[in-house]
């Protein structure tokens, strides 16, 4: 979007679904949640003592004051059987004083207690699921003092000749309807998309992602982050979930947030630089900051990461935009987004093992040359004045984040970044002449595009030209004709206003299909989105 200081103006008319979140309003969860969950660190080894010790440590270390005010129980908190009246029961060995007592105790300390259930007949751990008991379970949780529900999706099987996706939609829609009738409703975290995140074919995943923002406030969209005792690379696990999150920016808005899973700052497989990177990336995404770690044992360096006030402010920014890819090379990602009050965010990630020197021109940030931009490093607080480019030296797996203040005379931001196919990862590329195609992303300005307020896409390599629809997609001198105007839809389609056909990797342009992998694209942050 174009931003002039704090004023956000419309590019392409935006159509918002009538129902935003569980209560048709973003006010239930206007910014992403912050807190603690036991799963990635302790899995089923949760109990009353753990949560009391965690709360005490969060108070003494300043995490509560920093905003981490939610403590969420995950799977295995229940008894294996429901009570005689069919209500859920807690495990009395793990929680001798009971869940209501724990919720009240935590509330007096300034925390909110959240809980876990499953849309199937059993939870992932084999405990009683919610299927057939949704209203009763919701009432039970509310009576216990719970205000946040994470609903998993294990053991869901199609009923009434529905497809699996239709079954998930029916069950999560039912939960949405149950919750919206409560006063107040519970915050609703949906895990349904995680059961459809198949990189071989993303169509079903996107079909689920199309409806989850209308039902809840956040969604666990893909694979679980590596648990503390898990095998494999914790950094690779973070990068997998980071990658999935980059595909979903179009869905996020205030009141609904994409959830790439827990922060794992005490994982033994991570370097300090990697721990910093996960936090910086999640904050740049305005993702939930839910820590799964042994809080009393966190080091001073780990706590300093989690308490970084500047990055928390970015995460909690009221615009709720997700940082998107301005550029992608073999090892380096450059992400940008607009912030409230007219500032711009720049995040630069080194995915590789080398130590590159990265040059980021102001145009990649959606800005213009010849202005004096005040740039603040959000890790060390260093301030510099930027006019043409910023030069960054990045350690292996490091992430630098900068907040950029725009002077009044240079306060216009043009949405700028790569246009990439979310299935292949390839970038729309200006091939000179009239040709346009898709190639591996290589950090070139021929793959960086500006999106104008009229829906014109200009390659940064020649901004007088526009992406043009004809018998093929091409790059032509801009004329203002409708065959150069494009609309970005919530489905990820980039539809031409003249031909009503969609940009397509492989053929250039073709009839629009339903969530076809070849027609789903990521665009820069700030481009308004047309809802179907």
UniProtKB/Swiss-Prot annotation:
Keywords: Disulfide bond, Glycoprotein, Glycosidase, Hydrolase, Lectin, Secreted, Signal
Pfam family, one: Melibiase_2
Sugar-bearing residue positions: 47, 91, 121, 201
Signal peptide: 1-21
Active site positions: 152 (nucleophile), 210 (proton donor)
A cellular component annotation (GO) from this entry: extracellular region
Intracellular or extracellular location(s): Secreted
GO molecular function, one term: carbohydrate binding
Gene Ontology biological-process annotations: carbohydrate metabolic process
Described purpose of this protein according to its UniProt entry: Hydrolyzes a variety of simple alpha-D-galactoside as well as more complex molecules such as oligosaccharides and polysaccharides.
Family note: Belongs to the glycosyl hydrolase 27 family.
Protein name stated in the entry: Probable alpha-galactosidase A
Species classification: Eukaryota, Fungi, Dikarya, Ascomycota, Pezizomycotina
């Amino acid at each position: 979007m174009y931003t002039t200081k704090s004023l956000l103006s419309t590019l392409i008319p935006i159509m918002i679904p009538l129902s935003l979140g569980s209560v048709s309003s973003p006010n239930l969860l206007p910014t992403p949640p912050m807190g603690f969950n036991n799963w990635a660190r302790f899995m089923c080894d949760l109990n009353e003592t753990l949560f009391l010790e965690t709360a005490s440590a969060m108070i003494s270390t300043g995490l509560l004051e920093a905003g981490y005010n939610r403590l969420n129980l995950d799977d295995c908190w229940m008894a294996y059987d429901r009570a005689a009246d069919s209500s859920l029961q807690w495990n009395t060995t793990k929680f001798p004083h009971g869940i209501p007592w724990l919720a009240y105790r935590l509330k007096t300390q300034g925390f909110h207690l959240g809980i876990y259930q499953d849309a199937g007949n059993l939870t992932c751990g084999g405990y009683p699921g919610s299927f057939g008991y949704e209203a009763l379970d919701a009432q039970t949780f509310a009576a216990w003092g719970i205000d946040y529900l994470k609903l998993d999706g294990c053991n869901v099987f199609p009923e009434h000749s529905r497809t699996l996706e239709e079954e998930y939609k029916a069950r999560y829609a039912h939960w949405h309807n149950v919750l919206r009738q409560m006063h107040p409703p519970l915050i609703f975290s949906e895990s349904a998309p995680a059961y459809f995140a198949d990189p071989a074919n993303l169509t079903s995943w996107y079909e689920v992602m199309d409806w989850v923002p209308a039902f809840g406030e956040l969604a666990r969209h893909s694979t679980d982050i590596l648990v503390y005792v898990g095998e494999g690379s914790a950094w690779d696990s973070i990068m997998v979930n980071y990658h999935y999150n980059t595909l979903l920016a179009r869905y996020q808005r205030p009141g609904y947030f994409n959830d790439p899973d827990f922060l794992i700052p005490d994982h033994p497989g991570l370097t300090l630089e990697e721990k910093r990177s996960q936090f910086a990336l999640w904050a740049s995404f305005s993702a939930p900051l839910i820590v799964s770690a042994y809080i009393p044992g966190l080091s001073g360096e780990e706590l300093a990461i989690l308490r970084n006030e500047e990055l928390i402010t970015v995460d909690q920014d009221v615009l709720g935009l997700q940082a998107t890819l301005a550029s992608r090379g073999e090892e380096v990602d450059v992400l940008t987004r607009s912030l409230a009050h007219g500032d711009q965010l720049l995040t630069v990630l080194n995915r590789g093992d080398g130590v590159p020197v990265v040059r980021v021109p102001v145009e990649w940030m959606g800005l213009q040359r010849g202005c004096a931009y005040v740039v603040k490093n959000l890790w060390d607080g260093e301030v510099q004045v930027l006019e043409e480019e910023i030069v960054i030296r990045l350690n292996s797996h490091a992430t630098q984040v900068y907040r950029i203040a725009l002077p009044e005379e240079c306060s216009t931001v043009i949405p700028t970044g790569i246009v990439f196919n979310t299935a292949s990862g390839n970038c729309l590329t200006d091939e000179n002449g009239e040709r346009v195609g898709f190639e591996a992303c290589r950090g070139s300005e021929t793959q960086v595009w500006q999106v104008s307020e009229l829906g014109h896409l200009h390659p940064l390599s020649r901004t007088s030209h526009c992406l043009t629809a004809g018998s093929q997609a091409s790059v032509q001198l801009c004329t203002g004709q409708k065959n150069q105007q494009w609309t970005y839809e919530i489905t990820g389609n980039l539809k031409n206003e003249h031909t009503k056909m969609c940009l397509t990797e492989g053929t250039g342009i073709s009839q629009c299909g339903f969530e076809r992998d070849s027609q789903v694209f990521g665009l820069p942050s700030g481009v308004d989105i047309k809802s179907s």
